[in-house]
Amino acid sequence: ATGLRGGIVVDEHYQTNQPDIYAVGDAVVVKQQITQEDALISLASPANRQGRQVADVIAGLERKNQGSIGTAIVRVFDLTAASTGLSERAAKAAGLTTAVVHISGKDHAGYYPGATDLQLKLVFHPTTGEIYGAQGIGAKGVDKRIDILATAIKGQLTIFDLPELEFTYAPPFGSAKDPVNMLGYAAMNLAEGLSENVQWYELSNELANGAVLLDVRNPAEQANGQFKNAVSIPLNELRERLEELDKSTKYIVSCHSGLRSYIAERMLKQAGISAKNLDGAFALYRMVKPEELENV
């Protein structure tokens, strides 16, 4: 029998509806492990695993098809892009309550020669912390982080476990706080109510509804590009210049990567000023909406 998009329907032991006929690989319908919905996941790793499992089943051993989360990677010129689990769009389409964080980091300690940028995105449940998926892009180190997050999903770890994960560390290989740890910290800040974020695709609507963008980068950073119509107050001057901000206005705060804007968000909230953090900050916005920036 066939099912989704003509894929072969099999049971949990890879048996078709015909006696003694089994099917595995790209042609079979599997369960998307997170949503438990039917899926066609055409990847070599699950297909090879299925071959081993069906051989065990035919030999009389108990092996079950547990489905797949769909972990994939591709090289595009000098960049690597990888994903695991559900995208933000897929999670929302499945009806899951969804939150998202982006972080910018380096593949290893930034002060050690040869460090390159990478961007990571985490999709998760905002209260339980269940991890739905992750994506990453960068020159180096993306495979390592997505493999870790794929393992976390398979092992049913949550965002609250990510800061506690331990990795081998020396400056040529990583950072004392790995980008995966930082993803966990950022996600926990949302889950615990310490931060509220605005996604890049929500910014224009927020500004149209009266919010003001506050850029806390320093002048040297702003020489590499600026948000249009943003209020500029460097973070190290913000506490002394809080009186310049209107307590009746909602502020969306950005820096280069999101860390300083989180600090600024906390400062504003403690001063009784409404504030949210632009998730991914300038670094992400420059990647997805460069036409809306000045002097890029």
Predicted regions and their residues:
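FAD-site-proximal beta/loop scaffold in flavoenzymes
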Residues: 1-53, 152
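A short alpha-helix-loop-beta-strand transition element characteristic
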Residues: 2-5, 61-71, 97-101
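Active-site flanking residues adjacent to catalytic metal/cofactor-binding acidic residues
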Residues: 25, 214-216
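Short glycine-enriched, charge-decorated loop/helix-capping segments at active-site entrances
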Residues: 37-42, 137-138, 228-229
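Active-site-proximal substrate-binding core of FAD-dependent oxidoreductases
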Residues: 38-42, 57-84, 164-170
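Short, hydrophobic alpha-helical segments
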Residues: 55-62, 153, 191
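Flexible, glycine-rich terminal cap/loop adjacent to redox cofactors
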Residues: 78-84, 92-194
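Rhodanese-like catalytic fold shared by cysteine-dependent sulfurtransferases
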Residues: 160-171, 175-212, 219-252, 256-296
